[in-house]
A protein has these predicted regions:
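Non-heme iron-sulfur electron-transfer modules
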Residues: 2-5, 42-75, 91-121, 133-171, ...
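N-terminal Rossmann-like FAD-binding beta1-loop-alpha1 element of flavoenzymes
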Residues: 12-37
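Short amphipathic alpha-helices and their capping/turn segments at secondary-structure boundaries
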Residues: 25-33, 191, 235-255
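Glycine- and acidic-residue-enriched helix-capping/strand-helix junction motifs
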Residues: 70-71, 215-220, 269-281
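Central beta-strand plus flanking loop segment that forms part of the substrate or channel wall
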Residues: 224-237
Length: 283
């Protein structure tokens, strides 16, 4: 005889990826009364959209396109600066290690990298940053500017203005520890593992931009003034490395002319499809 009993599903969902897709999915689930775990390996939410400024043709913020996200008008706020919802727990610097179980009852092991800074103590004063001896290319600015090994969690600033440590480049010299007025820095921090139970998993892992370096005929990374579309976005952004002025990375001068190269990475023997977006944003 067949057993018709159905195991009750966990009323919680894990959303992997805190870009605009993950944020939108998380908000809609949370507004439906479901507990949401929103995880991302980056130290901030927003993904690639955070690097983009105003959208064509109305010059609006891309994050505003998901509003309203709540039935309560007074709860609306700019998602570019942070996310706050009672049913959403944000798990940043976090990756999925293992998934076990079945639909309706998953057990997920998460690994969270240390930030090196106690957020409850950090005031965001920035006293630690100038004394850091390490400078590396800023991933957020696509290498157009540099940052320290200890730097703001969100490059644009947010409601959470705390700092984090890049342990891949930190020398553990302790200069930031001595400078911190609130004893918020812990250089000896270790990764943390956590197991959560969820009924479903949403994969909103986003995309990775094509690496144009192997296409040597275009001179990307060989010539400083050959840049990608995302790098141009950062140059044109008011909060970018040139404060919105289109300047050549080589000498900081305004270019007299600009050439757009389309279909880099597509329409090749390896990728014979059309990129579908580059013509639009070039125009």
């Amino acid at each position: 005889m067949r057993n018709n009993r159905v195991k009750s599903a966990q009323k919680a969902v894990l959303v992997i990826g805190a870009g605009i897709g993950g944020i939108k999915a998380g908000l809609e689930l949370a507004e439906s009364g479901i507990q949401v775990y929103l995880c991302d390996r980056r130290p901030y939410i927003g993904g690639t959209l955070s690097q983009l400024d105003e959208w064509f043709p109305d010059d609006h913020c891309g994050f505003c396109q998901v509003l309203p996200y709540s039935m309560e008008a007074d709860e609306q706020y700019c998602l570019r600066w942070g996310l706050s919802h009672p049913s959403i727990e944000q798990l940043l610097l976090t990756e999925v290690e293992k998934v076990e179980g079945e639909a309706g009852d998953f057990s997920v092991t998460l690994s969270t990298q240390p930030s090196g800074v106690i957020p409850e103590r950090c005031t965001g004063c920035g006293a630690c940053e100038p004394v850091c001896p390490v400078e590396v290319d800023s991933e957020f600015e696509e290498g157009l500017s540099q940052r320290k090994a200890i730097y703001p969690r969100h490059p644009l600033g947010s409601a959470d203005n705390t700092y984090i440590i890049d342990y891949q480049h930190c020398t553990l010299c302790g200069a930031c520890v001595e400078q911190c007025p609130t004893a918020a820095i812990e250089l000896s921090s270790e990764p943390e593992r956590r197991i959560i139970s969820v009924g479903a998993i949403v994969a909103a892992t986003g995309f990775e931009e094509f690496d144009a370096r192997p296409t040597t005929q275009f001179g990307y990374r060989r010539f400083p003034n050959v840049v990608t579309s995302t790098e141009v976005e950062r140059l044109l952004s008011p909060n970018g490395p040139t404060l919105g002025e289109l300047k050549r990375p080589s000498d900081g001068q305004v270019p007299r002319s600009v050439a757009f190269l389309q279909c880099v990475g597509s329409r090749t023997s390896e990728n014979d499809y059309c990129s579908s977006a580059c013509c639009l944003y070039a125009l």
